[in-house]
Amino acid sequence: MSTPSQAEVRRMIAAAGTIVVKVGSSSLTQPSGHLDPDKLDALAAALAQVRLMGGRVVLVSSGAIAAGFGPLGFDSRPVDVATQQATAAVGQGLLMARYETAFGRFGIRVGQILITAEDTIRATQYRNVERTLDRLLDLGVVPIINENDSLASNEIRFGDNDRLSALVANLVRAEALVLLTDVDALYTAPPSQPGSRRVEYVPNVIDALGDIQVSGSGSKVGTGGMVTKLEAARVAAVSGIPTVLTCASNAGPAMMGDPVGTVFAPVKARGSSRRLWIGFAADPRGTIVVDAGAGQAIRGGRASLLAAGALEVHGDFSAGDPVWIDAESGEHLARGLAGFDSEEIPQMLGRNTAQLKRFLGPQYAHPLVHRDNLVLV
């Protein structure tokens, strides 16, 4: 697809029938870290206007931990995982109660969906989330999504919901992604640094960010930084979805296509939901290392990974789990869904189809990763 102009990207966003909006904890809280009802009400009002004009809106909202640590008597966000999870369990209900009141003023119902990273790994769970979101939107509800911080493992970090928002945009076939943060745009360097300039338009987020300095650290009440927001914009861009990044007070103008924040152009036409899931949603559980011949065939775009071209297998995974396909150098070539359990694959390595049938049985005469379940990276 040809690269659209900045004006064209902003028109795409303004014309979007389905919009996913992500807001971080720092955009919903007071300087003390407590939830700020006025900020939440202002955001709900901006989203309600889109919904009342016939648009479909999904909100990916952080803030459960930020909403909970004040009522529990903490002065600041807890740092240990167990206390964070307990705080999120208290805060999520408080957060949703505020949203229900705020949207209720406009006669709009909201529905809560809590997701863990595990829900993006198994295709069945992924499809269940997809169906639930579709039905909520059909019913005129504004789904409010958050990572299930009270159950999530691995230090409760999905990227402050940034990557999750891009995956949700794929799930609901959104035509725009809006990332709301505590700065008004992307800058060439930290905004406080002399000479820093606002970046109004990024035509190709994959190629054009080498000269932009970003920080991986987030605020004291959140977990994400600009790095995770750029990753979300990248996922959206290669999924055919335009993105705008700005501060929460600019939510309304951003969705109307006004010249605020930073817009990121889509760099590919939209792919299938299944292939987008394989490529972005599912965290690989292991790695299959391939020889040069298999690597060349995979790079060609339409080849399955056969056991004859596989050299090594690493990790513990089951058939159907996502895996990396790597060259001997360690370069990631593709992601795919494994056709066999990891414990079955070592005996298959290097064998052609005839050998697999003869020595292991006909049930093993199949690709390690079928081409329909493989996405180049």
UniProtKB/Swiss-Prot annotation:
One of its GO terms (biological process) is L-proline biosynthetic process. ATP binds at K22, T181, D182, T223, G224, G225, M226, V227, T228, K229. Signal peptide: none annotated. One of its GO terms (cellular component) is cytosol. GO terms for molecular function: ATP binding; glutamate 5-kinase activity; RNA binding. Coiled coil: none annotated. It is found in: Cytoplasm. Residues 285-363 form the PUA domain. It is an enzyme of class 2 (transferase). The keyword Transmembrane does not apply. It catalyses: L-glutamate + ATP = L-glutamyl 5-phosphate + ADP. Pathway: Amino-acid biosynthesis; L-proline biosynthesis; L-glutamate 5-semialdehyde from L-glutamate: step 1/2. Its EC number is 2.7.2.11. Substrate binds at S62, D149, N161. Keywords: Amino-acid biosynthesis, ATP-binding, Cytoplasm, Kinase, Nucleotide-binding, Proline biosynthesis, Transferase. SMART domains: PUA. Belongs to the glutamate 5-kinase family. Catalyzes the transfer of a phosphate group to glutamate to form L-glutamate 5-phosphate. This is Glutamate 5-kinase. It comes from Bifidobacterium longum (strain NCC 2705). The gene is proB.
